[in-house]
């Protein structure tokens, strides 16, 4: 009897099942990494907008305010277009009472000496969160990832 070269049906099916498992695992991991990328980018964009607002207050020797609309999940720096956060992202804003004109809006005011009204923004996306702290005395803006303090 001659030996035939090639693969049996069982061998081909085993390989296909293994490929399906690997593809499923990769797709699952990619979805988590996409969320991580989106929340990191949104957080860094908001930090950049806050720092821009602070620098404009110092350069122009005049108060400047960045407004956050919690209901519409957006923010606007002075003289800039409104920026909307990605779909599914949640916001929690803690700001000075004087900078909260309504339940759905809050702001961060920066003064000509660089100081601010201070506060905190927490961005939540799935099981991930980033926090932005704005120091009232110095106006320093710091970004903290997930579990950092």
Q: What residue ranges belong to the model's regions?
A:
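N-terminal leader/signal peptides at the extreme start of proteins
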Residues: 1-7
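N-terminal helix-rich module
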Residues: 2, 13, 25-51, 55, ...
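Hydrophobic membrane-insertion alpha-helices, especially the h-region
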Residues: 15-23
